[in-house]
């Protein structure tokens, strides 16, 4: 079969399967791939191809992840599936696989299990915005009431973590039966795909968001003023627009009087581009690496936040020994390191390499941040952990 041409015309959405071990995440991934390829065209991936997840490195952290793609009539999906629980934890915390929505797989034969809860909590902490439930192995449960009970339990568990448990879609199906070509169960996979299309809104593209550029370098150009350089993270900056300089020091306002790229003058700089931005009336010593340029009023500097952190194992080049409360490493945000102190959850005395943990961080100077911002934890330039801002305190 000829490979379908990748169409840029369809909106692109990132999703993934989450849930307890052996509840059928990988089987469901294979079933979606097969049923959608059969129904709408495309290439089907087998269970064994997906299960044999290649090893990747994200910020020095080893993660096993399978990536597959599939199409519905209106969208193109990129879907991630991980073999082990630890891979999910690392994936979600580093943002290696940023999900616009997740498919929570729960076996009807078991109901919600410890990792079901943990993956829902992680989704909440790292900011996965939407969850759809696929109740799997429903062919093995004869009792209609039991299925209703499991569905109710899952909905309550999601509500507990502030997802709209009463309103989100729950599809009862059997991934294995669908994979074996049973038409009735294949219909449930189509139903799941339709739920993805209708329930997960089209993600806002980086270019449509409010302008933000982390400052990497500062130069003064005689007769012209101060130029800051960096890669535009989101949005568009046009010549003549007001910008704020946020982080480290007090926030100040200035105007963009020029945009340069590869020594050419432009009218604007866009998300993904490396630009130099000329700032009106700003002195060279008033800006520094680690600050951000942003559209006024869209991002604030903060020093204290709750985070979800994965601590690198010794094998990944992390610490060989645990750390305790009072630990003072550097937190690397976007372009710079800031020293901070940590508070561990009650009853936690120490954190071992390879653990994931919730911690409250207090930085010695403020950094421009939103919930969902990723950071690295470093000691003398060496990465020992990865984290995500879950909740801003002050």
Swiss-Prot record:
It comes from Shewanella amazonensis (strain ATCC BAA-1098 / SB2B). GTP binds at residues 19-26, 81-85, 136-139. CDD domains: EF_Tu, EFTU_II, EFTU_III. The lineage of its organism: Bacteria, Pseudomonadati, Pseudomonadota, Gammaproteobacteria, Alteromonadales. Gene3D superfamilies: P-loop containing nucleotide triphosphate hydrolases (3.40.50.300), Translation factors (2.40.30.10). The gene is tuf1. This is Elongation factor Tu. GO terms for cellular component: cytosol. Residues 19-26 are annotated as: G1. GO terms for molecular function: GTP binding; GTPase activity; guanosine tetraphosphate binding; translation elongation factor activity. HAMAP family: EF_Tu_B. Coiled coil: none annotated. Residues 60-64 are annotated as: G2.
